[in-house]
């Protein structure tokens, strides 16, 4: 139970007979209002055609996609070039110099997903929000529900739930660290309050 609500996952059996999780269809279907997705390059090289391509070989690059307000579902499929250090989503972005943010980090080399925050070092959180994950073919299906400061992420068949305290609304975007990524089937949807 979290704040009076139960977070529900649907169990799914993997090919090796272990269990994974996925977002229940009823939750996904509650997000019905399509929100605008507009790529705004911030750092690095970003372009959109049939897919969104991001490249930053020597550091951090990111592009803004839209606004977070109320309950929002992000969905997309991420592919990365071999050697890419990290990629993922920028969440609750604020300020002209990215003064506030959370990240859903996908780290292929380390085989994990994690949530990091702008104030993680100097803040009051003394633990890491991360999960081990297996990646196939340099690709991951990403779903993220943002409800106020609650984040519920599904990456392939692994879930990670956390809070970004002191952050509300703001922007949402994509990032890459030392590599090249491709996002396809990117959607933002608003849900019921």
Model-identified regions with their sequence ranges:
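Extracellular glycan-recognition regions
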Residues: 1-193
């Amino acid at each position: 139970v979290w704040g009076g609500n139960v977070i529900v996952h649907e169990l799914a059996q993997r090919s090796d007979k272990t269990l994974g999780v996925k977002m229940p269809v009823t939750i996904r279907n509650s997000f019905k209002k399509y929100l605008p997705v507009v790529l705004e390059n911030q750092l690095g090289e970003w372009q959109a055609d049939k897919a969104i391509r991001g490249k930053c070989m020597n550091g951090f690059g990111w592009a803004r996609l839209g606004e977070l307000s109320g309950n929002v579902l992000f969905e997309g499929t991420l592919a990365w070039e071999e050697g890419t250090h990290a990629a993922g989503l920028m969440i609750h972005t604020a300020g002209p110099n990215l003064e506030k943010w959370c990240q859903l980090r996908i780290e292929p080399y380390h085989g994990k997903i994690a949530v990091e925050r702008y104030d993680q070092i100097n803040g009051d959180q003394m633990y890491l929000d991360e999960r081990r994950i297996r990646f196939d073919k340099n690709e991951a299906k990403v779903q993220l529900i943002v409800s106020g400061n609650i984040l519920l992420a599904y990456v392939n068949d692994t879930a990670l739930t956390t809070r970004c305290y002191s952050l509300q609304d703001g922007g949402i975007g994509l990032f890459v660290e030392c590599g090249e990524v491709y996002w396809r089937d990117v959607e933002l949807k608003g849900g019921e309050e």
